[in-house]
């Protein structure tokens, strides 16, 4: 029976695992965003001894001995505990005349919280920005939001000074925008995932947050608020409650297109 050194075979398996991962899982590894735990990953020596590789430290500390050839199969990628920083990769194997690796039918178990893969991908994009890229993005965002704010304030008069910022210090794993208000000023702190949103969504976001103080913003910006709600649904799997009020406004104007879009969001 053909044999190979343990370290060489383990490295081949690790490379084949990585090559066959989906792009999201690769991003997690590239960004060092989770500890990797292996299940069912072991090497078998020609005398029957086994060396289990449960994590990357086990690979680094692996003793080099002759191991038999096996056919390895990637069974699943478990991202259920990704928020706690853990990725679990499940393998199975059986004896073979030569080394083989199969990854045709593995499953992916996604996190069960109220965020989606699209949300996770945006968080990764945010975290991978270099400092100069981040500064440039924030400047572009600030300029864009100031223009959108000016447009909204042409239709709705507000006495307080309004400022809008990306909140670079918030917990990015929870989608939430914060609003502060005193007698003279309103400050809106926006979650970083919206740095990658288009103008219509941002206009809807801003109109929605400002509607806390003047309901007129709902009527002025209802079409864009629908687009914001659609994006929020894609990011959280939740239907925003404000859609009920928006539906009433769309009904009042006989806006069939908006009503159809609301119906799509509710039934996605």
Swiss-Prot record:
- Keyword annotations of the record: Coiled coil
Where does this protein have coiled-coil stretches? 132-159
Record has Coiled coil as a keyword: yes
Q: What is this protein called?
A: Uncharacterized protein MJ1409
- Which species expresses this protein natively? Methanocaldococcus jannaschii (strain ATCC 43067 / DSM 2661 / JAL-1 / JCM 10045 / NBRC 100440)
């Amino acid at each position: 029976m053909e044999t190979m050194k343990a370290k060489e075979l383990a490295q081949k398996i690790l490379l084949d695992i990585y090559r066959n991962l989906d792009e999201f899982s690769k991003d997690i590894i590239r960004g060092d965003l989770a500890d990797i735990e292996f299940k069912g990953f072991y090497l078998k020596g020609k005398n029957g001894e086994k060396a289990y590789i449960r994590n990357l430290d086990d690979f680094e500390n692996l003793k080099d001995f002759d191991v038999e050839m096996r056919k390895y199969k990637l069974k699943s990628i478990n991202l259920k505990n990704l928020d706690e920083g853990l990725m679990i990769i499940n393998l199975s194997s059986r004896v073979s005349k030569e080394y083989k690796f199969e990854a045709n039918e593995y499953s992916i178990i996604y996190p069960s919280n109220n965020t989606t893969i699209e949300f996770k991908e945006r968080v990764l994009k945010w975290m991978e920005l270099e400092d100069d890229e981040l500064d440039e993005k924030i400047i572009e965002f600030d300029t864009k939001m100031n223009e959108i704010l000016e447009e909204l304030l042409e239709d709705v008069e507000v006495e307080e000074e309004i400022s809008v910022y990306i909140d670079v210090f918030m917990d990015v794993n929870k989608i939430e925008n914060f609003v502060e208000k005193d007698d003279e000023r309103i400050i809106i702190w926006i979650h970083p995932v919206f740095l990658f949103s288009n103008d219509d969504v941002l206009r809807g976001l801003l109109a929605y947050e400002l509607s806390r103080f003047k309901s007129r913003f709902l009527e002025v910006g209802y079409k864009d608020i629908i687009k914001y709600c659609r994006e929020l649904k894609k990011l959280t799997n939740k239907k925003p409650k404000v859609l009920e009020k928006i539906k009433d406004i769309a009904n009042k104007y006989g806006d069939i297109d908006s009503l159809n879009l609301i119906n799509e969001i509710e039934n996605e």
